[in-house]
Curated annotation (Swiss-Prot):
Gene from which this protein is expressed: sigH
Name used for this protein in its record: RNA polymerase sigma-H factor
Gene3D superfamilies in the record: 1.20.120.1810, Winged helix-like DNA-binding domain superfamily/Winged helix DNA-binding domain (1.10.10.10)
Keywords from the UniProt entry: DNA-binding, Sigma factor, Sporulation, Transcription, Transcription regulation
Consequence of substituting R96A: Suppressor of mutations in the -12 region of the spoVG promoter
Highest classification ranks of the organism: Bacteria, Bacillati, Bacillota, Bacilli, Bacillales
Length: 218
């Protein structure tokens, strides 16, 4: 796609009067201002989509940037003959780019080793073959390429967890799901590493029992 500037470009106010599809036509003939307009217009939309996903150990801005790449691709690839609006097409491309990037990162083992090992550890140590990731995601099986936790799914049980977990357990869980290592959590909460591990084990047991009571299929 040619992104060089053309003479006679519209200003922002004029772009606002056009449909997105019309602005894209200008992008496709080299109007970089039109491209900037669409990127700016959809930036918050990308951030909203990025908030739905997070990867253990990843910086949220990394996911936002992947979403922006997906947005650019949607602008580049959108065709007038598509049987959908640009916004719907953009949402598809943004989501696909984010998920692909997360899967690629896990395949390349970009997540911290300690986070991966801990998340993959059975909830009741050797007494159970279900992991914390299995419980939170509601997945029957979960391989490293699928270590994507949907924030919306976690929010559904967050309120109940607030009732079941102690203050320490809640803090440990939040930091753990944010990708912190045991040592980092220990330093931040000024607790021994063993105390952090014990708290997380209690969280796992409470979480599993709660979901079983609710008869959620894992």
């Amino acid at each position: 796609m040619n992104l060089q500037n053309n003479k006679g470009k519209f200003n922002k106010e004029q772009f606002c009067q056009l449909e997105d599809e019309q602005v894209i036509e200008k992008v496709h003939v080299g109007d970089s201002d039109a491209l900037d307009y669409l990127i700016t217009k959809y930036r918050n939309f990308v951030r909203a989509k990025a908030r739905s996903y997070f990867l253990i150990g990843a910086d949220r801005e990394d996911i936002v940037q992947e979403g922006m790449i997906g947005l650019y691709k949607s602008i580049r690839d959108f065709k007038e003959d598509k049987l959908t609006s640009f916004k719907a097409f953009a949402e598809l491309c943004i989501t696909r780019q984010i998920i692909t990037a997360i899967k690629t990162a896990t395949r390349q083992k970009h997540i911290p080793l300690n986070s991966y090992a801990s998340l993959d550890k059975p909830i009741f140590d050797e007494e159970s073959d279900r992991t914390l990731l299995d419980v939170i995601s509601g997945a029957k099986t979960l391989n490293p390429e699928e270590m994507i936790i949907n924030q919306e799914e976690f929010d559904d049980i967050e309120m109940k967890m607030g009732e079941l977990l102690s203050d320490l357990e809640r803090k440990v869980l939040v930091l753990y799901l944010d990708g912190r290592s045991y040592q980092e959590i220990s330093d931040e909460l000024n607790r021994h590493v063993k105390s952090i591990d014990n708290a997380l084990q209690r969280v796992k047991r409470k979480l599993e029992k709660y979901l079983e009571i609710r008869e959620i299929s894992l």
